[in-house]
Amino acid sequence: MPLSPAGVLSSTSTASNRSRNRPRYRTKALSSEVDESLFGGIKPLNQSDSPIVLLRDKHAIRKTLTALGLDHKPETIQLITRDMVRELIIPTKDPSGESLIMSPEEFERIRWASHVPTREELEAKEQACKKEKEAIVDAVTTRKKIMKQKEMVSRNNQKLSDLEEVAKERAQNLLQRASQLRMEQEEELKDMKKIILNAKCHAIRDAQILEKQLIQKELDAEEKRLDQMMEVERQKSIQRQEELDKKRREERIRGRRHIVEQMEKNQEERSLLAEQREQEKEQMLEYMEQLQEEDLRDLERRHQQKLKMQAEIKRINDENQKQKAELLAQEKLADQMVMEFTKKKMAREAEFEAEQERIRREKEKEISRLRALQEKVQDYQAEQDALRAKRNQEVADREWRRKEKENAQKKMETEAQLRKSRLEQVAFKEHSLAVQVQRDRDEFERILRAQREQIEKEQQEEEKKAMERLQHANELRRQVRENQQKQVQDRIAIFEEGQRLKEEAQKRRERIEGIKKKKIEELRATGLPEKYCIEAERKANIPTNTSVN
């Protein structure tokens, strides 16, 4: 289906946004190659093949549509269903005529070339290459033997023909190539390849780091400029705030002056009102003194009752101390309950005092109300209020005595319940202690039996292991004697093999060192900076004086 103009425009804007967001690409590898077949091949298309059509980039399609005057909204059909309305684009032919058509074989070749092999595939490919190289080496070795045999047969000091010279040169080149491929598979040369690749990567990375540092400097300069702009704006804001604070201080000063004037005026009014109230206070002072004397007598009486109650509590506490000597653990719980009872009683007394305080405040309120009405019926109302207050006080006293009596009765019942609970707790703890002692005795006997059985079992296993160790020691002595005889024979063979391997290793090291030096020279020839070449020589353990030109 061809792309619609709207789709081309949206894809173009999306591509441009992505190009702005991506970092700028810089070419690092100058020897990169591009598969030119992606841009259209010269090979004629076989009409019998099934073509695969690949659209080119959207920018080219958009330009083509604009040039041909076909950049318009495509024809659509509106499809109305039960739950939605859709517009379907009617497919048309490709108006540009620039679609790339390639054969299935070419498409499969490109797809296979773009495939990223896995680690297993790479290992399998490496094994296949290794086997192929070994086969080539074997073939070359066989051909070399044949050539030597032919040379020995035909050695008659006569000059070789041109064809024989070419064959000989070709065989030598093939043999040299096979030897080089075999050396490339050595671990040292593989490590050398990694070192060279690492040096190239370091050079690229340093160039990228330098570029990032330049970008960071530009960003820092821009950030510094923005900070300076923000600092100027902040100074202006501080100046505006100081002016606003100055105006507010002036307004507060004017407000204080107005308040002082108002306070002076109110002070004069309060002075006049205070003189009037002073006269009223003198009239009510005698009445208040009488009420205070009654309150003092009432407080003294309550104080005496409190002392009696405290004496009773002290007596109870003394009894508890005696019982505590006998049952220390149970007495702790009892003391806690007594203290809780005391706290509750003190709370009740506080409530009573609060009630008395409330009554006193009500009296003061009543006095204030009487003061407002004293001009009319001051004497008569005062006597009635005093009698009413006295009756209220008597009722409150009777109620308090009734509550105290009930509290004393509850206290006695609580103490009886506590004594009963203590006795039950003592009996329960004695029973629990006896049960626990019996359980401990049974557990001790069970553990003792298990330990005896374990000791017997361990003794049997120890005897069995001692017998096995004896047999194993005899077997080891026999094997040691056999191994000593075998080692004498192996040392002789190893010494001979070692001499041969030492000579081969020396030759191999010389060949590898030569290849390493050659690769370092090739690396210098690519134009890589000298410091990376020196680092590669150091990692490859190549002497510097032998590698520097």
From Swiss-Prot:
Expressed in respiratory cells (at protein level). This is Cilia- and flagella-associated protein 45. It comes from the Eukaryota. Residues 119-232, 259-393, 434-522 form a coiled coil. Residues 1-29, 388-416 are annotated as: Disordered. Microtubule inner protein (MIP) part of the dynein-decorated doublet microtubules (DMTs) in cilia axoneme, which is required for motile cilia beating. It is an AMP-binding protein that may facilitate dynein ATPase-dependent ciliary and flagellar beating via adenine nucleotide homeostasis. May function as a donor of AMP to AK8 and hence promote ADP production. It is found in: Cytoplasm, Cytoskeleton, Cilium axoneme; Cytoplasm, Cytoskeleton, Flagellum axoneme; Cell projection, Cilium; Cell projection, Cilium, Flagellum. Its main location: cytoplasm. GO terms for biological process: flagellated sperm motility. InterPro entries: CFAP45, TPH_dom. Keywords: Cell projection, Cilium, Coiled coil, Cytoplasm, Cytoskeleton, Flagellum. Belongs to the CFAP45 family. Microtubule inner protein component of sperm flagellar doublet microtubules. Interacts with AK8; dimerization with AK8 may create a cavity at the interface of the dimer that can accommodate AMP. Interacts with CFAP52. Interacts with ENKUR. Directly interacts with DNALI1. Interacts with DNAH11. Interacts with DNAI1. One of its GO terms (cellular component) is axoneme.
